């Protein structure tokens, strides 16, 4: 288990699901990339194979031990301050929907501190419409490679989702609590501005990814 309760075995099974290609086509060829919260490198390694120099950051030594073809850095994202900047900073895994405002600002501050003057931050999030489609007491299932995932919604109160996520792969199963904050586009813009960033553009049709640039 990682410090935040993530099962390393599970994350080692999860394949990339189009994220490396989305990032690759959104940034210049050969652009340097800082992957924040890289996990086992399921995005970092394919980006390296596509010609990018990638620095992969995670707080878990166990996760980083599975990272290949990228330079691993063990650190809490919120505390990270490297002596260099990058053409692209990647904040995936819906970390922007963290429940606490202080956590979100700390994540964005790290993004801002490491993006070059002409670079961009690429962020994956759950948009407001994703939350609006959920109802307390419902379950939602899907597959990620060999892993079957199930989201059980307990409650949505004042924009805070209280849920449980379970994963199954073969005869193995992992269960985790899941909390996420709903942000609308106005709130998103305000949080970006507070961190010295400006909304750029949507990177996919479902508005699950967007770019931001330094102010």
Regions found by a protein language model. Name each.
Residues 92-93:
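Residues lining the SAM
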Residues 105-117:
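A short glycine-rich, Lys/Arg-flanked "PGG" loop and its adjoining helix->strand segment in the class I
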Residues 122-187:
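SAM-dependent methyltransferase
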Residues 81-89:
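A short acidic, Gly/Pro-enriched loop at the edge of an enzyme's catalytic core
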Residues 187, 191-215:
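C-terminal lobe and adjacent flexible extensions of AdoMet/dcAdoMet transferase-like proteins
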Residues 41-79:
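Class I SAM-dependent methyltransferase SAM/SAH-binding core
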Residues 1-39:
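Conserved class I S-adenosyl-L-methionine
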């Amino acid at each position: 288990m990682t410090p935040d309760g993530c099962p390393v075995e599970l994350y080692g099974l999860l394949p990339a699901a189009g994220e490396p290609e989305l990032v690759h086509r959104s940034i210049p060829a050969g652009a340097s990339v800082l992957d924040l919260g890289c996990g086992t490198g399921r995005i970092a390694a394919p980006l390296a194979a596509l010609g990018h120099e990638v620095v992969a950051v995670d707080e878990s030594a166990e996760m980083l031990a599975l990272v290949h073809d990228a330079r691993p850095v063990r650190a809490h994202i919120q505390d990270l301050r490297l002596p260099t900047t990058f053409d692209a900073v990647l904040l995936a895994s819906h970390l922007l929907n963290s429940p606490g405002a202080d956590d979100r600002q700390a994540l964005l501050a790290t993004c801002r501190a490491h993006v070059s003057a002409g670079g961009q931050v690429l962020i994956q999030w759950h948009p407001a419409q994703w939350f609006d489609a959920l109802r307390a007491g419902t379950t939602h299932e899907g597959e990620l490679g060999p892993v079957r995932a199930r989201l059980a919604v307990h409650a949505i109160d004042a924009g805070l989702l209280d849920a449980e996520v379970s994963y199954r792969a073969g005869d193995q199963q992992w269960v985790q609590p899941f909390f996420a904050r709903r942000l609308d586009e106005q709130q998103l813009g305000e949080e970006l501005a507070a961190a010295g960033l400006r909304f750029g553009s949507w990177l996919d049709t479902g508005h699950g990814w967007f770019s931001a640039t330094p102010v």
